[in-house]
Amino acid sequence: MADDGDMFLNFEIGDAPIKQTVKYTGGRWRDRVKAQKGEKGGQDQSKQASTARRDTGADYYTNRAAKRQRTEDGDSGRFSKTPRTGNAAERGPPPPPTHAMKTGLVSSRLFTSNPVPVTDFEELPQAEEAEPAQPSNAPLSAEAENFLSLGLSRRVSQHLATKLEMKAPTAIQKNTIPQLVKEDSDAFLQAETGSGKTLAYLLPIVHRILALSHNEDGTPKTTKVHRNSGLFAIILAPTRELCKQIAVVLEKVLRCAPWLVCTTVIGGESKKSEKARIRKGVNILIATPGRLTDHLDNTKVLDVGTVRWLVLDEGDRMMEMGFEDDIKTIVGKIRAGTLQKKNAEGVVLDGVLPSRRVTVLCSATMKMNVQKLGEISLEDAVHITASKSDMEKDAETGAVETAFSAPAQLKQAAIVTPAKLRLVTLIALLKSTFARKGSVMKAIIFISCADSVDYHFELLKSTTPRAEPEPKPEGEAPTKPNIHIESTVAPATYITSPANPTVMLHKLHGSLAQPVRSATLKAFSECKDPAVLITTDISSRGLDVPAVELVIEYDPAFAVPDHVHRIGRTARAGRAGKAVLFLLPGSEEGYISILPKSTPIAPQLYDSILQKGFATNINVPGTESGVLETDRQSWASRAEALQLHFEQRLLAPLPGATPVFESKSEKFAASKQGKKGKKDAKKDENKTPDNPLLVSARQAFRSHIRAYATHVREERVYFDITALHLGHMAKAFGLREAPGGIGGGVSRRTHRPVQPGDKTNKTSKSVGDGTARRPKKDDDDERDFGAADEDAGRRMKEKMKMMMGNMASEFNLG
């Protein structure tokens, strides 16, 4: 102690630094760097927090970035490009973070990080109201042409005019009917979709068969023709639906001659029933190539000796589907037999029917593969098109391949929308389509794969139970519900409106059973309410459904000819129609340039569709109010709220199930407690089952990505799988992250073939010669695959336990 009263203290602090530092050793260098950064970040955050508490409020907010001013209406407008319509004052910046974002809840952001379209929509010419185009596939004037002048009998012509209300033929019918009525040469029939190709070849066949028993004026002859008189014509079609439709059209025509019989033989039906119908007798047979080949090999009562016509409808499609060998077999068996001049009853066929077998090949698109089909089936064929000028030109140049465009009265549009906005844009388009009563009665949505069709059907259908039908008055038998359409037809939700409170939803694809497919297509055709059909390319060929006014290509076709057939489901027989194509920003926008177009395809951005579709409230299932609740009444807010609703609906646990784990740590902790190898995992009853809709969404996503990679080689420059953002595309299926296993497919185990001397006893004991037994080919359960899996799982579990339970042992914290 000093004299002046002051006190001096000496502290010994040692040689260690004042600030304690932590050094990480061991493990990978990436993990050490991450741990050091995390330690440093934690210290910096604590320092900043303490500094912020000491500072005044004014000083604290001085360093913050300036916030953008919120507009009064809260409308976000378009964020990548400003819309062409509307005043500039109505265009606002992106919406500010909602309260859900501030409180830590999940919010689905759709209008951020989207790719910029290549097309400059600002420089596109303003669309002008053009005069309605003259229909290119409409019937001709009744004063100029009629069926009687084309060479058809009076009986057939009167039946078409009075019963079927067909006063005049179309252009392709005008050029085809006289050729097939008077000549016996093969025909190469080509015309655009919806132009009446089916009747163009059916009417001459019916006319000439009818001439066996009736004169031109309709008076009967002495000879009689009935179902046992012989098989005169075979019509091949690629799909069962097209066969059914051809049969429906032919049955309407044959009402003028009820003694003539037609039938179908298609896959999915009972072969026993088909053989019974053939045994009773049939004059015109409509078949798919595979089933007809089966009957030619196994059905002895099927006699093709009297066959005079072989029609190949949609010949290019049959070649694409791999029916080349079947067609060769069919043509070979028909030509191998001797052409009978008289039938079994002694009726002379020559002079009335063709003296040779006539082959007719027809389609809307004739590609190069049809040349090969023509070499198989045609001999000196006449090329018939809708206009005489085309016929003369093809006769001079010998051209075979012609690119046919869509009907002239068809309006086409292409919507450029980012992957994240595809689903909500589709809902907005359908909602605006059915906003007015009577505006559109039926719409078809084409999707690339069956799994995606199933998912979108389950997503859009109403979850409320159907109302019981009203009881019938006394004396009337109650109508029985069709069990075949219970899973394929349902009322829709999200897309209804006060004007159309009921919109029926249908689904159709090739994986459904044939009775279900037929019943669904019939229900869609006969539906009196507004209806939507979600389908694959199975419905793109030849189907003629009345009142289809809108076709949506949600997934672009795999080839341009398929696109032509898709949009040909509308604007048929001179009626108006509209086709909409969904494209992603970027390389897909160039796809428009290679599409055949009789009318210009107008590209447009998604914002106009969202503004129109989400201008009013959206009806959603499972809520008390029945409508989608949003903080702000704008189309952008409704779009994001609808996307969030879809994601929450997929993640919702099943009734009575345990809550779904949200974080990865919770999932890992649950896996540690509940999974003890493969056998224990199978027996774990506490595992939460996934929502079936979530499982369907994941499978639909995987199938969609696989289908995206199957475009034809010439078009892959526009559909580049490597440029596809999987995370954004997952949003289009209501998923928050892209599921894995896209390229895995079905896992299969291969085994070495069992040698003749091997023993296949089910015991694992050695046989007498000392060799161990080898299991049977399908004996997967007896193979010892589980030992290696359990050992690997045990080692991985121990390593993960060491990492998660004791971090010091991994990094050797000092």
Curated annotation (Swiss-Prot):
Give a yes or no for keyword Translocase in this entry.
no
Function of this protein?
A: ATP-binding RNA helicase involved in the biogenesis of 60S ribosomal subunits and is required for the normal formation of 25S and 5.8S rRNAs.
From the UniProt entry, list the residue stretches annotated as the region Disordered.
26-102, 464-483, 662-695, 741-795
UniProt-listed PANTHER family: RNA HELICASE (PTHR24031)
Q: Which SMART domains match?
A: DEXDc (SM00487), DUF4217 (SM01178), HELICc (SM00490)
Q: Name one GO molecular function term.
A: ATP hydrolysis activity
Catalysis performed (reactions): ATP + H2O = ADP + phosphate + H(+)
Instruction: Quote the biased-composition stretches of kind Acidic residues, using this chain's numbering.
Output: 779-790
Q: What is its EC number?
A: 3.6.4.13
Coiled-coil stretches: none
Alphabetic keyword roster? ATP-binding, Helicase, Hydrolase, Nucleotide-binding, Nucleus, Ribosome biogenesis, RNA-binding, rRNA processing
Q: Which residue numbers does the motif DEAD box cover?
A: 313-316
The name under which this protein is listed is ATP-dependent RNA helicase dbp-7
Any single Pfam family the record assigns to this protein? CTE_SPB4
Record's compositionally biased regions (Basic and acidic residues)? 28-42, 69-78, 467-477
**Any idea where this protein resides?**
Nucleus, Nucleolus
Q: Does the keyword Nucleotide-binding apply?
A: yes
**Native organism:** Neurospora crassa (strain ATCC 24698 / 74-OR23-1A / CBS 708.71 / DSM 1257 / FGSC 987)
CC terms in the record's Gene Ontology section: nucleolus; nucleus
Residue positions binding ATP: 191-198
A GO biological process of this protein is: endonucleolytic cleavage in ITS1 upstream of 5.8S rRNA from tricistronic rRNA transcript (SSU-rRNA, 5.8S rRNA, LSU-rRNA)
